[in-house]
Curated annotation (Swiss-Prot):
The modification Cysteine methyl ester is found at C435. The keyword NADP does not apply. The chain crosses the membrane at residues 38-58, 128-148, 152-172, 183-203, 278-298, 347-367. The gene is CLN3. This is Battenin. The lineage of its organism: Eukaryota, Metazoa, Chordata, Craniata, Vertebrata. Changing E246A: Loss of lysosomal localization.
Length: 438
């Protein structure tokens, strides 16, 4: 890519005729750097969200915390579970899986709230290193824990890793062509699918949850390798024609912004400029908060209660299947930006709220006759959530100037985390209320 792919210099010979030097090598360099960055951001998205997803997939096991002799923990119950609360019409854990959600999201919320204020002062490399170490620590701590409390501490490490990583890598996209946002989003969707599917598959194959978690320690190493070895230097970026086409169609989010501003550090923005940019972002932040509130209220508040007795799947297995199908929908829609772009993300928020109302009604009245209908609804739920995420960040990338884009990406990160945190806080009392019903 380097500095030679941006423009073709013309030279004049002695007769005044212009000749063009052979562009093939610079073009190949540009294409090679493009694909290295594309793959790099996809892997960063995959590895960054992997531990977060696995902890949510393991939430039922973490809270059940059944043990046998030896060091294997969280043993999968048989296909006919014994209710933890025999007086309730639901098969409830004593603590809602929303507790795992809160441990998995509140540290991320704190990081994202503080990030726009001063995280940019810390270089990217130390942030990535801390993120990788915390991810590895989360797998080890949960795998070897002997209490729910210790396991939740491990979940907190996963939250720190994913939260710090998301703010870091989304801010980093400001120094690369806008196309990397699509690759990052696809990678985060892939983390959901591969994380949930690997946990489901390995436990179904007979591995204990402890062995399954320890087998995933290669993911943090892959994250570090992707950042330090695969990405090209951002100073050498030259977006070329694709960026020019996007800028021509761009509708400025802040009307006074300069259309030709260059990428730069958000540390140069004053507090007044940051507030002005943030107000312009609310059109996208609010619907994303609503989408994530609705879907995680479903995932961590209702999944555990959407239990069907007339199947061969145990309660824990049903929960894992719900998580896997949700993540499959997220992956598909987060990878669809090239063929489907949605500007009005409010529509996605409305549809996700309708999902929440419908499934909450089913938990209360129990009118769905088959678990396979729930499978389809959960897949659809994931499609809506993934589409909201990728289109929100893509729209912001198009509608903010390069000068504001790094700050805008970091500030918008708060949306999903805020929605998830609110859903967890409300899902806890809902769980206690429903589980007391006889």
């Amino acid at each position: 890519m380097g500095g030679c792919a941006g423009s073709r210099r013309r030279f004049s010979d002695s007769e005044g005729e212009e000749t063009v030097p052979e562009p093939r090598l610079p073009l190949l360099d540009h294409q090679g750097a493009h694909w290295k960055n594309a793959v790099g951001f996809w892997l960063l998205g995959l590895c960054n969200n992997f531990s977060y997803v696995v902890m949510l997939s393991a939430a039922h096991d973490i809270l059940s915390h059944k043990r046998t002799s030896g060091n294997q923990s969280h043993v999968d119950p048989g296909p006919t579970p014994i209710p933890h609360n025999s007086s309730s019409r639901f098969d409830c854990n004593s603590v809602s899986t929303a507790a795992v959600l809160l441990a998995d999201i509140l540290p991320t919320l704190v990081i994202k709230l503080l990030a726009p204020l001063g995280l940019h002062l810390l270089p990217y490399s130390p942030r990535v290193l801390v993120s990788g170490i915390c991810a590895a620590g989360s797998f080890v701590l949960v795998a070897f824990s002997h209490s729910v409390g210790t396991s939740l501490c491990g979940v907190v490490f996963a939250s720190i890793s994913s939260g710090l990583g998301e703010v870091t890598f989304l801010s980093l996209t400001a120094f690369y062509p806008r196309a990397v946002i699509s690759w990052w989003s696809s990678g985060t969707g892939g983390a959901g699918l591969l994380g949930a599917l690997s946990y489901l598959g390995l436990t179904q194959a007979g591995l204990s949850p402890q062995q399954t978690l320890l087998s995933m320690l290669g993911i943090p190493a892959l994250l570090l390798a992707s950042y330090f070895l695969l990405l090209t230097s951002p100073e050498a970026q030259d977006p070329g024609g694709e960026e020019e086409a996007e800028s021509a169609a761009r509708q400025p989010l802040i009307r006074t912004e300069a259309p030709e501003s260059k990428p730069g550090s958000s540390s140069s923005l004053s507090l007044r400029e940051r507030w002005t940019v943030f107000k312009g972002l609310l059109w996208y932040i609010v619907p994303l908060v609503v989408v994530y509130f609705a879907e995680y209220f479903i995932n961590q508040g209702l999944f555990e209660l959407l239990f069907f007795w007339n199947t061969s799947l145990s309660h824990a297995q049903q929960y894992r299947w719900y998580q896997m199908l949700y993540q499959a929908g997220v992956f598909a829609s987060r990878s669809s930006l090239r063929c489907c772009r949605i500007r009005f993300t409010w529509a996605l928020a409305l549809l996700q709220c309708l999902n929440l109302v419908f499934l909450l009604a089913d938990v209360w009245f129990g009118f769905l006759p088959s678990i396979y209908l729930v499978f389809l609804i959960i897949l659809y739920e994931g499609l809506l959530g993934g589409a909201a995420y990728v289109n929100t960040f893509h729209n912001i990338a198009l509608e903010t100037s390069d000068e504001h884009r790094e700050f805008a990406m970091a500030a918008t990160c708060i949306s999903d985390t805020l929605g998830i945190s609110l859903s967890g806080l409300l899902a806890l009392p809902l769980h206690d209320f429903l589980c007391q019903l006889s």
